[in-house]
Amino acid sequence: MSTALATLAGKLAERVGMDSVDPLELITTLRQTAFKGDASDAQFIALLIVANQYGLNPWTKEIYAFPDKQNGIVPVVGVDGWSRIINENQQFDGMDFEQDNESCTCRIYRKDRNHPICVTEWMDECRREPFKTREGREITGPWQSHPKRMLRHKAMIQCARLAFGFAGIYDKDEAERIVENTAYTAERQP
């Protein structure tokens, strides 16, 4: 284990009140929970840097990692993690949503601004198709079971990026698209 990895893990453990736990045990547990598959020390360090930067807890899945195709990682922040970093921002002054079957608009209010930051996300641009197994079987995901909730999450995350300048972190859907390296083109609506 590298010194940088031990230092970052210790800093994170201290922040979440786990500094009395053996650092090696913490790192072992994190390797098993915050990564899909094996992780190198470099990938692990990258995740811990982002977790510490945004004050996110990888033990509670506020942040975890998807390995990319170039042996790096894509830092994935869960909805609870996004909610934490939004609510902990000192300038945050509330948010609201307007939603119908086609779109969701999120407004985030900042204490230091006169006007809210508004973002609209569209169902036809964000929705994902069911996953297909190698055998061709369809597996439905959250976009099929809870499409409006997923769209609301997308609108909140994109609005938070504009309102607070969050960069280098992604939601699970974005991470999957990055790793798949696929672009999605929405169908034109009449």
Can you describe what each PLM-predicted range is?
Residues M1-P190:
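Glycine-rich anion-binding surface patch
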